[in-house]
From Swiss-Prot:
The lineage of its organism: Bacteria, Bacillati, Cyanobacteriota, Cyanophyceae, Synechococcales. The gene is rsmH. It catalyses: cytidine(1402) in 16S rRNA + S-adenosyl-L-methionine = N(4)-methylcytidine(1402) in 16S rRNA + S-adenosyl-L-homocysteine + H(+). It comes from Prochlorococcus marinus (strain MIT 9312). NCBIfam families: 16S rRNA (cytosine(1402)-N(4))-methyltransferase RsmH. One of its GO terms (biological process) is rRNA base methylation. InterPro entries: RsmH, SAM-dep_MeTrfase_MraW_recog, SAM-dependent_MTases_sf. The keyword Transferase applies. Its EC number is 2.1.1.199. This is Ribosomal RNA small subunit methyltransferase H. Specifically methylates the N4 position of cytidine in position 1402 (C1402) of 16S rRNA. Keywords: Cytoplasm, Methyltransferase, rRNA processing, S-adenosyl-L-methionine, Transferase. It comes from the Bacteria. SUPFAM superfamilies: Putative methyltransferase TM0872, insert domain, S-adenosyl-L-methionine-dependent methyltransferases. It is an enzyme of class 2 (transferase).
Length: 300
């Protein structure tokens, strides 16, 4: 079952590290000039773009998002800037701007509203279908993924993308459940089955034992690593000389890719040898910000 596109009221995502994103763009030498253009490669609910459009009165932004629910919500949030925001249905790895821009920002985190909406299937806090697609038109969802992968491949995926040491045991349990009982009823049943692979003392810790496996499945369903690798290769070509790339990541796989790209791409000057992290005040207000890491680079 899909969420009704007519109801975007649930999409109330709180953008992460907004002040730090704004500060990172001050490295661009012409940031205060007229006719400034930028790309928000992960528009989401429009939070980062909202603050940018408020700060820079002559700024025009192209906002990209593959999630139709996010685009509808962002359109409402940014209505007062409708003459300066161009919202596109696109995955950032497949986009090609017609002209170069002054900056590109990207927040690689899963939108909190995607997590909180049980119909999207990202979370086990509330039961929902095993979906996990950021773009609801993708062919393979989480249910189809676990059904079609061989046990060994599923274990490797859970280990690689979730850093889960019990990946083999979990994959074996998932494939056995599917063989004996058929499809899982939803996210909660899968999470319960995964938790059963852990010793009793580890089942009731602060972080749910299924968290890493769910992360791995989400990354695989949306091909997040492959998409990010492609994006990092093409994004310098989007920029004007001196242009800025600011990327927020939330797990080590993504951060390593961004760090390596900014360090080794000869087209770029790395402006953050160490990542910028959220302030204590922000983490206190928004717990989901705590693992955010911002890295910034400038086109030579």
């Amino acid at each position: 079952m899909q969420t009704d596109l007519s109801d975007s009221s649930f999409f109330n995502h709180k953008s992460v590290m907004t002040d730090e994103i704004l500060a990172s763009l001050e490295h661009y030498p012409l940031i205060h000039n007229n006719q400034l253009k930028g790309i928000d490669a992960t528009l989401g609910g429009g939070g980062h773009s909202y603050h940018l459009l408020r700060k820079y009165s002559d700024l025009h932004i192209i906002g990209l998002d593959q999630d139709p629910f996010a685009r509808k919500s962002a359109s409402k949030k940014l209505d007062e800037f409708k003459n300066r925001i161009d919202i596109r249905a696109a995955n950032f790895a497949d986009f090609e701007p017609k002209e170069k821009v002054s900056f590109v920002i990207a927040d690689l985190g899963v939108n909190s509203n995607q997590i909180d909406d049980p119909k999207r299937g990202f979370s086990f806090q509330k039961d929902g279908p095993l979906d996990m697609r950021m773009n609801p038109f993708l062919e393979v969802d989480a249910e189809k993924l676990i059904e079609t992968l061989q046990e060994k491949d599923l274990a490797n995926l859970i280990y690689k993308y979730g850093d889960e040491r019990l990946s083999r045991k979990i994959a074996r349990k998932i494939k056995m459940d599917l063989k004996v009982n058929g499809k899982y009823s939803g996210t909660k049943e899968l999470a319960y089955s995964i938790a059963g692979c852990f010793p009793p003392k580890q089942r009731y810790k602060k972080i749910h034992p299924a968290t890493r496996t769910f992360q791995a499945l989400r990354i695989a369903v949306n091909k997040e690593i492959e998409v990010l690798e492609k994006f990092l290769q093409i994004v310098p070509d989007w920029l004007l000389p001196g242009g800025i790339i600011s990327i927020i990541s939330f797990h080590s796989l993504e951060d390593r890719l961004v760090k390596s790209s900014f360090k080794n791409d000869q087209r770029l000057k790395n402006l953050t040898k160490k990542p910028i992290t959220p302030s204590e005040q922000e983490v206190e207000i928004n717990k989901r910000a705590r693992s955010g890491k911002l890295r910034v680079a400038q086109l030579n």
